């Protein structure tokens, strides 16, 4: 794994969108979307962050919980905006069906937002079922043929936590591998690579040009993919403290693990920050699984994508240098 040898570390981060990139700086968040071969649409977005309302969430551990929630809120808002821009820039030549006309009459301009909300709700429900209840159910089935899995003592808790954790990681990797085979998602992953490369270029204090960005690494230690992988790994340890059948009810174990998600989130966030700031043997070991997963969630971008990423990061770089974490 390549060492992090950047000349400075910035707090600027971002996420890949549909034909675009969101960049978030300390004072400004902007969404840049390519709407035509020679046109990039730039629009600022904002939210009232949790730490701005409650100082508790500025403290270590708690800031990770707030950071995840705020990032999801911003990403959702940015995704909605990029989807709108992408639709506006696409000419629909086919005659809409009767069902499409009915939807348009009922929802009008809000149709895309309604569909996104429905998709988000279904996505969350699927994720909860797939990553919490399915692993627990499969372990219980396996207990019929694996003696070590039986009972509710310490050994059973250990094996159930390991079984569930490893299965979650496998399911997560399979999910992103399947996504990477879809044409639209391939382009999103390419934009993801452009985002990382551009941030690295800025941290290396090189001029933000397409050629300079191209030569940067697309694997960044402070990435949402790395955060997800770390959360899954930390979740294995957290699971050791949850009984196989809380109060004698096996169904409650995944419920308890969902309630304990903030703990995994807070620890994972702090580990990501440490890996981003320090480069030593310990941090490289911690960061390795996430960087490996980024080989799936990032792809080499083309020049047009890099141009979008450059415009996005330029828009959020503060003149006072308040984004610099260390140098």
How would you describe each model-predicted region?
Residues 59-81, 164-189, 261-277:
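Hydrophobic alpha-helical membrane-embedded segments
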Residues 82, 131, 135, 139, ...:
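Alpha-helical transmembrane segments of polytopic integral membrane proteins
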Residues 155-169, 248-263:
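Hydrophobic alpha-helical transmembrane segments
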Residues 2-17, 21-23, 91, 150, ...:
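Polar-ligand-bearing catalytic/cofactor-coordination segments
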Residues 1-90, 94:
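Divalent-cation
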Residues 92-146, 156-182:
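Hydrophobic alpha-helical segments characteristic of transmembrane helices
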Residues 110-129, 216-241:
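Transmembrane alpha-helical segments and their cytosolic interface motifs
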Residues 124-150, 231-256, 269:
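Juxtamembrane "helix exit" motif at the C-terminal ends of alpha-helical transmembrane segments
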